[in-house]
Amino acid sequence: MTEGRNKEELEDITLLGNQNNKYDFDYRPDVLESFDNKHQGRDYFVKFNCPEFTSLCPITGQPDFATIYISYIPNIKMVESKSLKLYLFSFRNHGDFHEDCMNIIMNDLIELMDPHYIEVWGKFTPRGGISIDPYTNYGRPDSKYEKMAEHRLMNHDLYPEKIDNR
C-alpha cells in the first residue's frame, strides 16, 4: 500500500483549499502549479474534462464557449487541478482564435510539466452555424511518445460524434 503525500511534497500547492483565490479574467499562465508524479515508472493517462471554457473572438470580442479535453501521460510533474481551473478561467477575456487557445494551453502545460505525451482538444459551440474542434498534441521527441503523437493525430477523429447543437 502506498503512503499518502507528506507536507514537503505539497508545499508548492498553494491554491487548493484556499478560500481567498483571485479569479483573473486575463490570461495568466503563472497561476499553474505542479506536483511530483509518484508513479514515474508507469505509463498512464490523466484526463481533464473542462466543460466551461470561455475565451473571446479576437475580431468581434464576442465570447466563445467550449468543452476542452486535456489528456497526458505524466513524466516527473503533474498539473494541480485547482490551478488548471484558475488558469483556464483566465482565458475569459483573452482574445484569440480557437486553434491558438488550444496550442497555447498545450504549450503552457508542456512548459510546466514536460510530459511524455499530451493532447488538447477543444469542442467549441457553434457560432455562425459552424463549430470548430481544434486538436493538438505532442510526444517527447525521439521516443515512442513521438510516434504515438503522430499516430493519434492522424487518427484522432475517425469516428466523429453526431453534432446536434452540442
UniProtKB/Swiss-Prot annotation:
EC number(s) per entry: 1.7.1.13
Signal peptide extent: none
GO BP annotations, alphabetical order: queuosine biosynthetic process; tRNA modification
Broad class of where this protein is predominantly found: cytoplasm
Active site annotation, chain numbering: 57 (thioimide intermediate), 64 (proton donor)
GO molecular function, one term: preQ1 synthase activity
Catalyzed reaction equations: 7-aminomethyl-7-carbaguanine + 2 NADP(+) = 7-cyano-7-deazaguanine + 2 NADPH + 3 H(+)
Pathway(s) of this molecule: tRNA modification; tRNA-queuosine biosynthesis
SUPFAM superfamilies linked to this entry: Tetrahydrobiopterin biosynthesis enzymes-like
Chain sites annotated for binding substrate: 79-81, 98-99
Listed GO CC annotations: cytoplasm
A Pfam family: QueF
Keywords, alphabetical: Cytoplasm, NADP, Oxidoreductase, Queuosine biosynthesis
Subcellular localization, as worded in the UniProt entry: Cytoplasm
InterPro entries cross-referenced by the UniProt entry: GTP-CH-I_C/QueF (IPR043133), NADPH_dep_7-cyano-7-deazaG_red (IPR050084), QueF (IPR029500), QueF_type1 (IPR016856)
Protein task: Catalyzes the NADPH-dependent reduction of 7-cyano-7-deazaguanine (preQ0) to 7-aminomethyl-7-deazaguanine (preQ1).
Family: Belongs to the GTP cyclohydrolase I family. QueF type 1 subfamily.
Protein name (Swiss-Prot/TrEMBL): NADPH-dependent 7-cyano-7-deazaguanine reductase
Organism: Staphylococcus saprophyticus subsp. saprophyticus (strain ATCC 15305 / DSM 20229 / NCIMB 8711 / NCTC 7292 / S-41)
Gene: queF
